[in-house]
Regions:
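Short beta-strand scaffold positions
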Residues: 6, 153-154, 172
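A charged, aromatic-enriched C-terminal amphipathic alpha-helix characteristic of glycosyltransferases
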Residues: 173-176, 180, 187-215
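Carbohydrate-associated surface elements
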Residues: 10, 29-30
Length: 215
């Protein structure tokens, strides 16, 4: 190939370190084209709620069955197939919304943050799916941003830098920290994050990042 677009700087470095000689560009984040727009939301009040969309089975994301033990004041809204709620710790903190198509989710998402996490553990992202977060750009991150949801993401994920630099969410080492972090986040800080997220969401809807990578 004459030119390869890596998902992000971490993936670009991995390709270079592993012998890729092609010219490399960087995408930054996946655009997310959809005719649907996020519904305007009233002012957010505490306690915050966290949305997770994706595979919900214990095999793919066992962390979902452990995280409830560390939740006290906020709630988790789960979208997807295969959640076995009776196996989950702290199941009273979960709202299982079932499967919703992405375009519909943009317009109807219930939550204040979108969670990007994978694997078996709440204390770090483990296993093949979890470790891959160090190199890839999960589509769900872009989906959350189109829903105008600031992102909660693993600190070592490749996209954590993008989240930090753009002020569109929170980077955490462990989900065990989430209760304390959400309790101390002011409504003004959240409103600023949400405003920045909406701005990036606008870019995602226009194919901004692909166009930039091709320049």
């Amino acid at each position: 190939a004459d030119y390869i677009i890596a998902h992000n700087e971490k993936m670009k470095k991995w390709l270079e370190d592993n012998g890729c000689k092609a010219k490399l560009g960087v995408l930054g984040i996946f655009d997310y084209l959809s005719e649907t727009s996020a519904a305007p939301k009233q002012n957010t009040e505490k306690p915050y709620s966290v949305l997770y969309a994706g595979a919900l089975s214990p095999r793919k994301n066992a962390f979902l069955y452990e995280v409830g033990a560390f939740v006290h004041s906020f709630s988790l809204n789960l979208y997807g197939n295969g959640f076995e709620i009776n196996q989950a710790k702290g199941k009273e903190h979960f709202n299982y919304m079932g499967f919703v198509k992405s375009d519909d989710l943009i317009a109807t998402a219930q939550g204040d943050f979108g969670l990007v996490w994978d694997g078996t553990s709440v204390s770090t992202c483990t296993g093949d799916f979890g470790e891959y977060l160090q190199y890839n750009n999960p589509h769900k991150t872009s989906l959350y941003i189109r829903c105008q949801l600031p992102v909660i993401i693993w600190n070592k994920a490749a996209l954590a830098d993008f989240v930090r630099e753009n002020g569109i969410g929170i980077c955490v080492d462990s989900l065990e920290e989430l209760e304390k972090i959400l309790n101390t986040l002011s409504e003004e800080e959240y409103a600023e994050m949400k405003k920045r997220t909406a701005k990036i969401g606008e870019r995602l809807s226009q194919g901004y990042f692909v166009r930039k990578a091709l320049q």
